[in-house]
UniProtKB/Swiss-Prot annotation:
Name the UniProt record assigns to this protein: Ceramide glucosyltransferase
MF (Gene Ontology): ceramide glucosyltransferase activity
Domain notes: The D1, D2, D3, (Q/R)XXRW motif is a critical part of the GCS active site, involved in catalysis and UDP-sugar binding.
Enzyme class: transferase
GO cellular component labels: Golgi apparatus; Golgi membrane
Gene3D superfamilies registered for this protein in UniProt: Spore Coat Polysaccharide Biosynthesis Protein SpsA, Chain A
Job description of the protein: Participates in the initial step of the glucosylceramide-based glycosphingolipid/GSL synthetic pathway at the cytosolic surface of the Golgi. Catalyzes the transfer of glucose from UDP-glucose to ceramide to produce glucosylceramide/GlcCer (such as beta-D-glucosyl-(1<->1')-N-acylsphing-4-enine). Glucosylceramide is the core component of glycosphingolipids/GSLs, amphipathic molecules consisting of a ceramide lipid moiety embedded in the outer leaflet of the membrane, linked to one of hundreds of different externally oriented oligosaccharide structures.
Annotated source species: Xenopus tropicalis
CDD domains, alphabetized: Glucosylceramide_synthase
Pfam families: Glyco_transf_21
UniProt topological domain (Cytoplasmic) ranges: 33-195, 305-309, 370-394
Length: 394
């Protein structure tokens, strides 16, 4: 009995520690969002002396928003940049979209590369290789096809690239769109994701997604260039790690990386979350423990049990109150990331929040069950450490 009592006491202490850690993350991310995101910062260098930037744009297929998203890059207000559009297949409809924009903006330094270069299993790296090899500026901006920008987005990112910074990244968020699936995505990228993303970066953990990353080409070349990351599916994580390992700091842009895909659904969102969870589990095995207990419902149960064991509080009353507080703080976080009025009602938020939180265990168990992922046109079997092998159809 003494051993059991000691174990229960240890679990109760763990629940208390979990409570303080998770609420520290809540407060930290909200304060950072209010102080840093969507703020106009003073220019750290004259406009005319901003460094040149080579934009690498990987393209695969089209969606209803692709041409509008791409056009925002042709309309950037920046003194010196080039756009390197990379398409894998000649018959890809994205080729026609690119040619249309190249004809519409002849004064913009932009080129189209078709065919890619096979250097590994990562299709995004393979697609970008021709553009990377001819990039002429010291800064490389890799930005996904579903991202849209403002005219001053690149200026904001370049101003964050100070002397000791090697990588500038944008917090992923989602543009206002119609439909419940869009609301669900917006709630996730405005609550759970920024809480972990911001907390990790502020406390010194390198957490970067590759949707919009500005990097020093010299540092990437020292790490072996893009080809060195072609063995990984999550190339963004390993690029960031390589830059950090060489002593460079990271900085987060004040503007978010605004996702604006024209194709979205609840099933697509769920599949994307499962794919990301699989990658995290294989790259960082500690995720198996940390991720489930950081979600609202599981954390509330653990902390509620600890409160009952130590203080004899009612578990269900504590669970409901804790979830309500989490729900409210998530809404505050969402409004901060949005930087303005939301495109949906508080009722829509409540429903989307509950469904998103209810999905978490299913997403996590699905990720554990099957180590293979489908991404772009291929299927891959993940290995521990982040590498992968392509599954070829026989």
């Amino acid at each position: 009995m003494a051993v059991l009592d000691l174990a229960l006491q240890g679990l109760a202490i763990f629940g208390c520690v979990l409570f303080f850690v998770l609420w520290f993350m809540h407060f930290l991310s909200i304060v950072y969002t209010r102080l840093h995101l969507n703020k106009k910062v003073s220019d750290k260098q004259p406009y005319s002396k901003l460094p040149g930037v080579s934009l690498l744009k990987p393209l695969k297929g089209v969606d209803p928003n692709l041409i509008n998203n791409l056009e925002t890059f042709f309309e950037l207000d920046y003194p010196k940049f080039e756009i390197l559009l990379c398409v894998q297949d000649l018959d890809d409809p994205a080729v026609d979209v690119c040619k249309k924009l190249l004809g519409k903006y002849p004064s913009v330094d932009a080129k189209l590369f078709i065919g890619g270069k096979k250097v590994g299993i990562n299709p995004k790296i393979n697609n970008l290789m021709p553009g990377y090899e001819v990039a002429k500026y010291d800064l490389i901006w890799i930005c996904d096809s579903g991202i849209k920008v403002k005219p001053d987005t690149l200026t904001d990112m370049a101003n964050q690239m100070t002397e000791k910074v090697g990588l500038v990244h944008g917090l992923p968020y989602v543009a206002d769109r119609q439909g419940f699936a869009a609301t669900l995505e917006q709630v996730y990228f405005g609550t759970s994701h920024p809480r972990s993303y911001i907390s990790a970066n502020v406390t010194g953990f390198k957490c970067v997604t590759g949707m919009s990353c500005l990097m020093r080409k010299e540092v990437l070349d020292q790490a072996g260039g893009l080809i060195a990351f072609a063995q990984y599916i999550a190339e963004d994580y390993f690029m960031a790690k390589a830059i950090a390992d060489r002593g460079w700091k990271f900085s987060m842009a004040t503007q978010v990386a605004m996702q604006n895909s024209g194709c979205y659904s609840i099933s697509q969102f769920q599949s994307r979350m499962i794919r990301w969870a699989k990658l995290r589990i294989n790259m960082l095995p500690a995720t198996i423990i940390c991720e489930p207990i950081s979600e609202c419902f599981v954390a509330s149960l653990i902390i509620g049990w600890a409160a009952h064991h130590i203080f004899r509080w009612d578990i269900m009353v504590f669970f409901m109150c804790h979830c309500l507080a989490w729900f409210i703080f998530d809404y505050i976080q969402l409004r901060g990331v949005q930087g303005g009025p939301l495109n949906f009602s508080k009722l829509d938020y409540a429903v989307a929040w509950f469904i998103r939180e209810s999905m978490t265990i299913y997403i996590f168990l699905s990720a554990l069950w099957d180590p293979t992922i489908s991404w772009r046109t291929g299927r891959y079997r993940l290995r521990c450490g982040g590498t992968a092998e392509e599954i070829l159809d026989v």
